[in-house]
């Protein structure tokens, strides 16, 4: 469990954690950030030279990582000064990636969504401090006071008290957005506004409140509020739009060292947090708006005062360690400073089923980069951002970023379960008659679980899809099952331990919610 949470936490703030030490928080009761040391000036020619090296940097990363495809764009001032594709959309097809190839953004969607919210805040009628329940009367968390008080900003800063990635495993089981959100009331909470815990569905609830206030669904709101005004014609918050595009990048996973097409990732349930797809040409328009403090091509798209809180430290996301300052999160953005004292805005995105993305913007330099790949997260987009901004600031790459990110991610992509790597018992105790285990089991959070004897094999059926999984006997009343999905790495093994009228499913026991009662 801890390994998975660490993997997700790293991916949620990957660039912020290693590349850019962040400013102290001004939320959660901490002191306001001190004024940073005035940054050293960066020569304009040094930026130009860094851009000129991107072709080689990208080609070298493609060669060393062997990721099938990648697209990169750089915005300087209000202009896209670099936009290029590398490699293939699909490893088994020669069709090339270009700057218009559409990729799934994964958690970079959070930053785009935050600018949709900022646009609505600027239009009035809703604010970052608006309680979610004013727009979603049905919304509830485990504590009545928190349910009434939690705001759009709290959920966008990951400080609601919901635990790390609450709701994600419900999505893997086939539950839709509404079904996941209504079940969050069963999840035990951390102290309100005191603990940072990265969630997709907490943020999705906040976005749903904003959409409700606008009277339209989130995907349509995003289109009308952001994508259309910016001319992002190849961007959508609907999976069906991504799937229908001819020039799209397929996800890939690594099997025995080789990249192969992954299972399609359909993230509509958490669309505000992970469901956007876009090209780097479109992302460059969004980055130009970001650098322009809400202005694009001479037009005001997002109110600057409404956008500013999203781009300011709101919650400490990582404690200081190994000589690095703490990391901080705004509303949908990692907010930090580079070693030269320049403010940075960034986010990473990752689908274990085959997508890794990242952007970094430094407003004081009027400069931003975005990198999209169609492969499992191994640190490629973050490495390119780090290399590029090393060249921008210092004229040289100062660390082996590929090794830093690769080493940080490698152990975190391993399977989970106490029995992983364990030999089967040499002399296991026999199971009881299978009829002793069959029946309908109940769990408020995960819903009903059916255990049936199918030709001498126990099979469990659960979730909204539903998920149908055979059980294998391990020892006595303990059986096992395997999973391979967005949150369960290949090789994951879970125990299913029966006792009297209940069964404990190890994989689903996050926050102690893994007991199903018959």
Protein language model regions, located:
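Short, well-ordered beta-strand elements
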Residues: 357-360, 365-374
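Bacterial Sec-dependent N-terminal signal peptides
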Residues: 20-42
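Peripheral terminal and inter-domain segments
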Residues: 338, 382-518
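A short acidic/small-residue loop/turn micro-motif
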Residues: 88-91, 376-378, 487, 511
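Short, conserved catalytic-motif segment at the N-terminal edge
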Residues: 44-103, 122-127, 140-142, 176-187, ...
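Short, glycine/proline-biased beta-turn/loop segments that scaffold the active-site neighborhood
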Residues: 127-143, 230
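Short, surface-exposed loop or secondary-structure junction motifs
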Residues: 86-90, 143-353, 357, 388
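N-terminal secretory signal peptides
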Residues: 1-25
């Amino acid at each position: 469990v801890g390994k998975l949470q660490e993997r997700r936490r790293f991916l949620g703030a990957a660039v912020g954690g290693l590349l850019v030490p962040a400013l102290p928080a001004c939320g959660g009761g901490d002191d306001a950030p001190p004024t940073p040391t005035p940054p050293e000036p960066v020569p304009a020619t040094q930026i130009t030279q860094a851009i000129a090296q991107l072709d080689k940097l990208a080609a070298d990363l493609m060669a060393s990582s062997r990721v099938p495809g990648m697209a990169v764009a750089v915005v300087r001032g209000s202009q896209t000064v670099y936009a290029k594709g590398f490699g293939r959309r699909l490893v088994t097809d020669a069709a090339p990636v270009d700057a218009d190839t559409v990729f799934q953004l994964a958690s970079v969607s959070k930053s785009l969504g935050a600018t949709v919210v900022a646009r609505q805040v600027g239009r009035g009628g809703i604010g970052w401090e608006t309680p979610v329940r004013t727009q979603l009367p049905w919304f509830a968390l485990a504590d009545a006071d928190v349910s009434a008080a939690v705001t759009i900003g709290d959920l966008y800063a990951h400080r609601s008290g919901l635990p790390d990635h609450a709701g994600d495993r419900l999505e893997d089981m086939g539950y839709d957005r509404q079904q996941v959100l209504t079940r969050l009331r069963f999840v035990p909470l951390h102290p309100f506004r005191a603990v940072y815990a990265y969630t997709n569905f907490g943020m999705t609830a906040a976005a749903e409140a904003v959409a409700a206030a606008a009277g339209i669904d989130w995907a349509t709101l995003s289109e009308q509020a952001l994508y259309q005004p910016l001319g992002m014609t190849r961007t959508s918050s609907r999976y069906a739009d991504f799937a229908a595009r001819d020039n799209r990048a397929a996800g890939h996973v690594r099997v025995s060292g080789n990249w192969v097409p992954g299972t399609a990732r359909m993230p509509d349930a958490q669309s505000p947090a992970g469901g956007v797809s876009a090209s780097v040409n479109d992302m460059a328009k969004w980055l130009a708006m970001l650098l322009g403090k809400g202005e694009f091509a001479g037009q005001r798209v997002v109110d600057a005062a409404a956008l500013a809180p999203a781009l300011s430290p709101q919650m400490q996301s990582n404690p200081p360690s190994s000589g690095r300052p703490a990391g901080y999160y705004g509303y949908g953005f990692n907010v930090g400073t580079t070693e030269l004292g320049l403010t940075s805005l960034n986010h990473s995105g990752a689908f274990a089923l085959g997508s890794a993305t990242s952007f970094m913007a430094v407003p004081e330099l009027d400069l931003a980069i975005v990198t999209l790949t169609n492969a499992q997260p191994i640190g490629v987009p973050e490495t390119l951002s780090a290399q590029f901004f090393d060249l921008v600031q210092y004229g040289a790459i100062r660390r082996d970023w590929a090794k830093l990110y690769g080493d940080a991610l490698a152990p975190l992509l391993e399977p989970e379960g106490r029995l992983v790597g364990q030999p089967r018992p040499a002399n296991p105790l026999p199971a009881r008659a299978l009829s002793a285990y069959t029946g309908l089991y109940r769990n408020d959070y995960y819903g009903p679980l059916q255990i049936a004897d199918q030709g001498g094999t126990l099979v469990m059926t659960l979730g909204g899809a539903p998920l149908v999984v055979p059980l294998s006997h391990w020892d006595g009343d303990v059986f096992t099952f395997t999973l391979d999905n967005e949150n369960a790495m290949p090789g994951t093994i879970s125990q299913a331990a029966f006792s009297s009228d209940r069964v404990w499913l190890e994989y689903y026991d996050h926050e102690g919610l893994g007991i199903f009662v018959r």
